[in-house]
Amino acid sequence: MSGLSSPWDVVLGHPFDREPCRSTLAAAEAAALLETVYPPREDWFAALRLTPPERVRVVILGQDPYHQEGQAMGLAFSVRRGVTLPPSLRNIYKELESDLGRPAPDAGDLTPWAEQGVLLLNTVLTVAAGRANSHKNLGWQTLTRQVIAAAARLPQPVAFVLWGAPAQRAYFEAIGNRQQATTERLPLEGKAPPKGADAVASEGPHAPRLVLTAPHPSPLSAYRGFFGSRPFSRINEFLAANGEAPIRWTL
């Protein structure tokens, strides 16, 4: 059994019944027999389990799971309660506080976001303990690009949040090419986004899309345009404009 949630398994056409996803899963399971792999096996597909297709309203793409003990829980950027906030998540919270004018959360568990329809998807679903991006060649990207493409075809409004070049590349590869979506570069720190400049890409008359790009929230790049990008309020404005309830970003 793959552990992939039934709704996504159906939408994706049972990907683990065929190659290459079958081999990817087998390779990850073999690695987990030889060394510690994060997150735990039961959480490899946590993002898809907590956010089924019919509930997706936002997709936030990450790269691969945290590789230190006790951190990874199957949701991009999220850590378990009681775990020290990683630097990128700390910067996400700083931007949330600046954007919404509310105190930053203390805990790093983003499960409440996932349960509201925020798909927190890493493009690589496993990692070896202590070795960042060590499973990048297992082939998880085939599955996660299928998920991204499926999310882009959903009938409801969906916002895509692409922080950093790897996330942006994953999105555009998944949908085919850049001409299939209009993408706005978010402003540099200290500059407000142009009024009415939100990027909306329509995949059909009933499926408006918002695609937001910005530098990664890592301390190495957050000051190059992530801070000041206001993704949380802009997502909620997009959802409201399309008749959807806002995301409760405070935890």
Where are these regions (language model features)?
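A polyanion-binding, active-site-adjacent surface
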Residues: 2-169, 174-175, 204-213, 217-238, ...
